[in-house]
């Protein structure tokens, strides 16, 4: 059986990789969205690990609700990205900072 520390280490590594990905790649909006989703999945892994370790199902149910909200968030983010690409012909973050209402 895999110990709790292994899951927490994996979650910390995934979280750190996503933070590094956000800081290293600030130009591509798709990569930024993927790094944010990876960060959320790392937190969810820690929720599931603690939930299993403590024998409580509340953490796993909470992760289920987080994943449904994250799926809706991803769909909305990608829809906004498609509209921005149609209007500006780019997904470069540096060129999208001057949005007009």
UniProtKB/Swiss-Prot annotation:
Enzyme Commission (EC) number: 7.1.1.-
Membrane-crossing residue ranges in chain numbering: 4-24, 30-50, 61-81
GO molecular function annotation: NADH:ubiquinone reductase (non-electrogenic) activity; quinone binding
Cellular component per GO, a single term: plasma membrane
Compartments reported by the entry: Cell inner membrane
InterPro entries per the UniProt record, alphabetical: NADH_UbQ_OxRdtase_chain4L/K (IPR001133), NUOK/Mnh_C1-like (IPR039428)
UniProt KW keywords: Cell inner membrane, Cell membrane, Membrane, NAD, Quinone, Translocase, Transmembrane, Transmembrane helix, Transport, Ubiquinone
Bilayer topology: Multi-pass membrane protein
GO biological process: ATP synthesis coupled electron transport
Enzyme category, top tier: translocase
Origin superkingdom: Bacteria
Catalytic reactions on record: a quinone + NADH + 5 H(+)(in) = a quinol + NAD(+) + 4 H(+)(out)
Chief site of localization: membrane
Family: Belongs to the complex I subunit 4L family.
Described purpose of this protein according to its UniProt entry: NDH-1 shuttles electrons from NADH, via FMN and iron-sulfur (Fe-S) centers, to quinones in the respiratory chain. The immediate electron acceptor for the enzyme in this species is believed to be ubiquinone. Couples the redox reaction to proton translocation (for every two electrons transferred, four hydrogen ions are translocated across the cytoplasmic membrane), and thus conserves the redox energy in a proton gradient.
Subunit structure and binding partners: NDH-1 is composed of 14 different subunits. Subunits NuoA, H, J, K, L, M, N constitute the membrane sector of the complex.
Name the record gives this protein: NADH-quinone oxidoreductase subunit K
